[in-house]
């Protein structure tokens, strides 16, 4: 089998198969010899910010000289991006090796009467093998969807469980309130394992606290007042992170952190990751100064990323993410005329996102496009929604590459923001790589 054949096989698997049992995943891992056992794993769930938190964790551990495996989703351009050793995606040969091992286990499982694993399960099984072969010191696991029933939740003894900000997303799977969604995310909490979480949604935070206490876990809640901006430039944000472990009577400690991103929401993500590493100090032995150095080196594509002069790509894909995007866009670019390139998938609340964009940054013009895949919304339907929201100048172009080139030419001396979907971000990155 070739690499291309392996990718085609995986892409042909239904992403949301009917069997979501963790026992199902566990039986397949058993056939692979449970490569995940005995590994030092940090497990990360949440609605927004999961990938960024994972990326901060990675650079801090790398700053300490550790070999780090990182399983993430979705990919932007190539499926290999989901499996990273350090900051490098795995090569095609390693990808194919892992797939063939997993395919052998799947075939045996099917002969025994089992059902085929989902798209995400298959990738997770491959990740477990890849990180075992790479002899990683730590593994950072990003939940795919939810938490309680996610394939990654088969792990038994993580070092820490992190839950990032909670908002409404994937409501058809996770529930229609932040409390219900938090309940699904809190499903990753394991007995006695430290829980570090974003507490800015009070209702969601109460659910997470309750679950942590039920499981006998020490828990650490971060709120906005933990992060105080000191200075902001086009090169990033310096801020003071202050933490006081009130439950254990600790005194307040303040750390000056520098993130290389211009988005204010990254302060919370960096703080969650930094606090987690402080809590795990006895395990990794990295000083606070070196951890701060790791924070300053974090790179994570398509999160308020400037890809060309005056052109920013952001992966915000739900109303809460769009609200954070608008806050940053308005702060840095209020003196520029703004062009927006927008696309979305059908299971996202695109009406609210569109309304927030029109009311929040008042674009001079909007160009809508259509991303690849069965879940796409047509560019014409999106354009009509922008008109209903009060946007005056709107045009549509179905091809993402042509839409991007058109938007770049239309922006003039202003700013272009490309937003609405990580899939849009990935297709733009792919388009730029071909130029």
Each language-model region and where it sits:
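Short functional linear segments
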Residues: 1-46, 53-66, 71, 107-114
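ATP-dependent carboxylate-amine ligase catalytic core
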Residues: 29, 34-37, 63-156, 172, ...
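Extended acidic/charged loop-beta regions that coordinate divalent cations
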Residues: 123-173, 205, 209-254
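Nucleotide phosphate-binding/pyrophosphate-handling subdomain across enzymes
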Residues: 133, 138-141, 149-162, 166-170, ...
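Beta-strand->loop->alpha-helix junctions that form or flank phosphate-binding loops
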Residues: 198-199, 211-233, 259-264, 291-297, ...
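C-terminal helical cap/extension that packs against the catalytic core
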Residues: 201-216, 220, 311, 354-415
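Active-site-proximal loop/hinge segments that shape catalytic or ion-binding/gating pockets
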Residues: 421
